[in-house]
Amino acid sequence: MKETENRGRVPRLRFPEFRESGEWETIPLSQLAKRSTQKNNRGELNSVLTNSAEFGVVDQRDYFDKDIATQGNLEGYFVIEKGDYVYNPRISKMAPVGPISKNNIATGVMSPLYTVFRFNNSHNDFFAYYFKTTGWHQYMRQTSSTGARHDRVAVTNGDFMAMPLPVTLLEEQQKIADCLSSLDNLITLEAQKLGALKTHKKGLMQQLFPA
């Protein structure tokens, strides 16, 4: 990759094969995705998912160590399929305007307080990584207000879906996503190695000193 001089609609770093591909476009989310408003009307789904700022979309039981939602009120929850995205308006230090995450685990249901949407193109990991940046935060601050509880962002569905997103060629999007994904895999592998080394050290310390 090479740093480019144009800092407008062209990123600072760009893969060589895309340097002459022109500027990126800015397209509203509504032209790239659709809101998913399917409700769990018959209560057939009972796997409740949540979107945390730190871990993304996770099973509620794993995150809270218990079921927060009860079976009786799941019929009003949104159905979220694997590959869907979800916006949690809850404000935190890690997510000052709330996190947007991709559901990479399984089909389940989400609180109606969340916004669930689905990209038209299934190859959309590029946007999953974009939503981990702060590039969209300014728009959310400008078009939303803090809710009555002062811990949630209040934004209309129309304003949320009008969010401008940076868009480039699908090939470049995929290249970026693949690059960042490979780094994620490397980080995971190194973390596992570090964990193994810590365990090995602990075992040595127990054996190198008299009990």
Regions found by a protein language model. Give the residues of each.
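A short glycine-rich beta-alpha junction/loop motif
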Residues: R9, T107-L113, S145-E171
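Non-catalytic DNA-recognition/assembly elements of restriction-modification systems
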Residues: V10-N40
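Short, well-ordered beta-strand elements within core beta-sheets of diverse protein domains
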Residues: P16-E17, I68, T115-F119, M161-V167
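Short coil/turn segments at secondary-structure boundaries
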Residues: R42-T50, Q142-S144
